[in-house]
Amino acid sequence: MVQLYPEKLLNIITTDTMEEKLVTSFKKYGVSGYTILRARGAGSSGYDSDISGFDSNMMIKVIVPEHRLQLILESLERRIRKGYHLTVFVSDVQVINPEKFE
């Protein structure tokens, strides 16, 4: 049986203009990698069709050990309080190779 290890999956939905700021923040907190996907949908701010290609939405996925998560969440919460549009949610995941996320 394959050994699995617990980690946290941080998902952030925001605008493309936030990418550089968030990536810089991730590096500051020791995040080793991330995945960025285009995102479309509707929510509290209305519908985003991504027709213009300008300031469209993206989803960033980051797997982190629990001990790194709190500082990252505090940083995101500060940005939200400053008025940045961020939707943040965290899930429990299991990975085969935990050293990849340290």
Regions found by a protein language model. Name each.
Residues 1-102:
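Positively charged, small/polar-rich N-terminal and surface patches that mediate targeting and assembly
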